[in-house]
Curated annotation (Swiss-Prot):
Mostly expressed in leaves and flowers and, to a lower extent, in grean pods and roots. It comes from the Eukaryota. It comes from Glycine max (Soybean). This is Jasmonate ZIM domain-containing protein 1. The gene is JAZ1. (Microbial infection) Interacts with the pathogenic Pseudomonas syringae HopZ1a protein; this interaction leads to its degradation.
Length: 232
């Protein structure tokens, strides 16, 4: 800042005409001002904080070598990429295989679901189920003699049930016998009276009746008289 006013004052004192144009002078003064500003800024940075050390030539050469190696590695990788893309074995190994489906089994009124069940195991399970079903059907069909034995047992048991059902109780038998005798006696009386009426109305009377004491042929005569009276 001190140089700029000094030059202006010296020019005025000398009274000489400026050799350079005002534009060039202002540009030079501006460049000097900027240089002084930069110098002051560098000095303040050096006081406030440490300056970074300048890179050595060895470090620069090492970084260049490392960059060359990285470029070589990248070039070799780019050359190897088409081989990876074209190789089908690598594709198969890296490509994820298809997920195995689920297996659902209905057994004893329940639904069982197995995740990621391979198809080979499913075929084995089906074969085992068919074998067990065939064995069970064979064991059920093998003994045909069982129904015959059951029928025989049923036939042998039938008379026992019939006898037990036919045998009346003593109380019921007495009541039935008491009811049958008066009915029979009243029926006989009715038939005798009817027979007498028929004989009285007929053209001739039947005198071939046997005495009441004959017990051997009493029942067939009563039956014949019943049939005769009913026919009339």
């Amino acid at each position: 800042m001190s140089s700029f006013p000094n030059t202006v004052a010296e020019g005025r004192r000398s009274g000489k005409a400026p050799e350079k144009s005002t534009f060039s002078q202002t540009c030079s003064l501006l460049s000097q001002f900027l240089k002084e500003k930069r110098a002051s800024a560098d000095s303040t940075l050096g006081i406030g904080g440490k300056m970074e050390p300048k890179a050595n030539t060895k470090a620069l050469l090492g970084s260049l070598q490392n960059s060359d190696g990285a470029l070589k590695l990248s070039a070799s990788a780019m050359e190897f990429l088409p081989q990876l893309v074209e190789n089908p074995c690598i594709k198969k190994s890296r490509s994820p295989g298809p997920e195995s489906p689920q297996l659902t089994i209905f057994y004893a009124g329940k639904m069982l679901v197995f995740d990621a069940f391979p198809p080979e195991k499913a075929t084995e399970v089906m074969e085992m189920a068919t074998k067990l079903a065939s064995n069970n059907s064979g064991t059920e069909e093998s003994p045909p003699s069982l129904p015959v034995t059951t029928e025989k047992l049923a036939v042998s048991k039938m008379p026992q049930t019939n006898t037990s059902s036919e045998t009346p109780k003593p109380g019921n038998q007495g009541v039935g016998s008491d009811m049958r005798y008066p009915r029979r006696a009243s029926l006989l009386k009715f038939l005798e009276k009817r027979k007498e009426r028929v004989n009285a109305r007929g053209p001739y009377q039947m005198n071939n009746l046997k005495p009441e004491g004959s017990s051997s042929g009493g029942e067939p005569e009563d039956q014949c008289s019943k049939q005769f009276d009913l026919n009339f």
